[in-house]
Amino acid sequence: MKIVEVKHPLVKHKLGLMREQDISTKRFRELASEVGSLLTYEATADLETEKVTIEGWNGPVEIDQIKGKKITVVPILRAGLGMMDGVLENVPSARISVVGMYRNEETLEPVPYFQKLVSNIDERMALIVDPMLATGGSVIATIDLLKKAGCSSIKVLVLVAAPEGIAALEKAHPDVELYTASIDQGLNEHGYIIPGLGDAGDKIFGTK
């Protein structure tokens, strides 16, 4: 499995600010979107382009345009919505596929409760967005849904990832690609990432 920990100074700086305990909802939300945008920049670096001739201000001009598979952004509800706008800044024409998952706090297993995928997802590259890759359960279950629907080109974008989640994802779906702003220390006894970001969903939506 391709694993990319983005080490760009802007990514590290912005993620560091997100770890502050008393960060405001507004600031956390802004930074989640900004880091999501930067991760998208990295995740789409291998997109193919083709030459196209357009009419410029002084006559015909040859330009590069992206070709190949179109993109669907797949936020995992609810926290994934916090990264979606940042992703769309780079790929504004992408279609949105939504998957709802929550984690059973006793078993730590993902529980699906909603899905609405674009009709031609088998023709698109999927960018799954979720702030945290902890145990990996929610992301793995989402990939299961996408593959069942015919999607074969999948990349996962997360703000922070635990080694345990990475290992589980690689075992279940070695053909996907993972892009993260940080590979953190690991999980505590409750399945939360250390040092992590706390509850990203609560911080994005201002709930507790």
Curated annotation (Swiss-Prot):
Pathway: Pyrimidine metabolism; UMP biosynthesis via salvage pathway; UMP from uracil: step 1/1. Uracil binds at residues 193, 198-200. Induction: By pyrimidine starvation. CDD domains: PRTases_typeI. Allosterically activated by GTP. Pfam families: UPRTase. Belongs to the UPRTase family. This is Uracil phosphoribosyltransferase. It comes from Escherichia coli (strain K12).
